[in-house]
Amino acid sequence: MGKDTIADIITSIRNADMNRKGTVRIASTNITENVVKILLREGFIENARKLVENKNKKEFLVLTLRHRRNRKGPYRPILNLKRISRPGLRIYFNYRRIPRILDGMGIVILSTSRGIMTDRAARLERIGGEILCYIW
């Protein structure tokens, strides 16, 4: 785990999905909880629960991933995640310039002045912000 918590979340979920793991354990912060709420609401993950370790009182989120199989049987990852804005290069858009991912099939997660939200919610509220990641 590094200093970029969003990149850590994305990497953990992507690695677990590619290795066909059912669950992922990530550190719990305000940002990670908000991103996980969006993933739950949009249906990219099945379940999320908070876990507290008794030894050192650290809080973790345990995510249950949603998997998909093709008709012929081979495994196909359901999540494609891409980190856009990073600590070394912040990327901001106003609400008119927020990109659409696969014509609305994917989502863009933004950090706005009103909290972390999806691209659809930001367009409805007519506010822009920092583009955190793309998920499709």
Curated annotation (Swiss-Prot):
Subcellular location: Plastid, Chloroplast
GO-annotated molecular function: rRNA binding; structural constituent of ribosome
Pfam family, one: Ribosomal_S8
Keywords, sorted A to Z: Chloroplast, Plastid, Ribonucleoprotein, Ribosomal protein, RNA-binding, rRNA-binding
InterPro entries registered for this protein in UniProt: Ribosomal_uS8, Ribosomal_uS8_CS, Ribosomal_uS8_sf
SUPFAM superfamilies tied to this protein: Ribosomal protein S8
Gene Ontology cellular component terms for the protein in this record: chloroplast; ribonucleoprotein complex; ribosome
GO biological process, one term: translation
Disulfide bond annotation, renumbered to this chain: none
Main localization of the protein described in the UniProt heading: plastid
HAMAP family: Ribosomal_uS8_B
Family as reported in the entry's similarity comment: Belongs to the universal ribosomal protein uS8 family.
Protein purpose: One of the primary rRNA binding proteins, it binds directly to 16S rRNA central domain where it helps coordinate assembly of the platform of the 30S subunit.
Self-association state and partner proteins as the record states: Part of the 30S ribosomal subunit.
Protein name: Small ribosomal subunit protein uS8c
Organism the protein comes from: Citrus sinensis
UniProt gene name: rps8
